Amino acid sequence: MIKIIRVGRERLREAYEIVNKVDQGMNVPEWFVAEPYEEFDFWMNEGRGLLYLAVDEDENVGAMFFVILPGLHPDNLGYDLNMEEEQLKLCAMMDTAAVLPEFRGHHLQYEMMQHAEADLREMGYKYLLCTVHPENIFSRSNVMKQGYEKLLTKEKYGGFLRDIWMKQIIE
């Protein structure tokens, strides 16, 4: 039985090890752009990052999911969508999902996103935004299944083509 838990900054290194392992094992490197540890740490330190882990019954960590609460920070994907300032403040970025190969097949990306969505709804966030490489059928299928809508395709993260997806969770 695998459970999803929300954790604090004290488990960030552990989560980042998963990001590194997944990054190194990517068959199509363009599909996954691993941010540096300092990027995750910045958001956690600011109190604007949410970190989720998937752990098995032996407490082995097999997946991580990171949410950024960007506010008016220039990294907010809402700027790409020409959102107004009040909308930007209600955006959460479903930023990074990484699942170790031995934990795949359990829909962990989906489950972690669902946990985050429930927390974000409770916190009053209205817009969930994420990016997916246009050819990454796995992530694309995952966000479509959760009700996200593709709004834009553009270069992000130093020249990588990405689709920007959005889901409105509060009317």
Task: List PLM regions with ranges.
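Conserved beta-strand-loop-alpha-helix junction that forms the acyl-donor binding cleft
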Residues: R104, C130-R140, G158
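A short beta-loop-alpha structural element at the N-terminal edge
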Residues: M1-I18, V28-E30
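Conserved acyl-donor/pantetheine-binding loop and adjacent beta-alpha core of acyl/acetyltransferases
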Residues: A63-T96
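C-terminal "cap" of GNAT-fold acetyltransferases
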Residues: E155-E171
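Conserved active-site alpha-helix within GNAT-family acetyltransferase domains
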Residues: E122, P134-T153
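Conserved acetyl-CoA-binding loop-helix of GNAT-fold acetyltransferases
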Residues: T96-V99, G105-A118, S141, K145
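Active-site rim helix/loop that mediates acceptor-substrate recognition in acyltransferases
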Residues: P29-E57
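Conserved GNAT acetyl-CoA-binding A-motif
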Residues: L120-V132
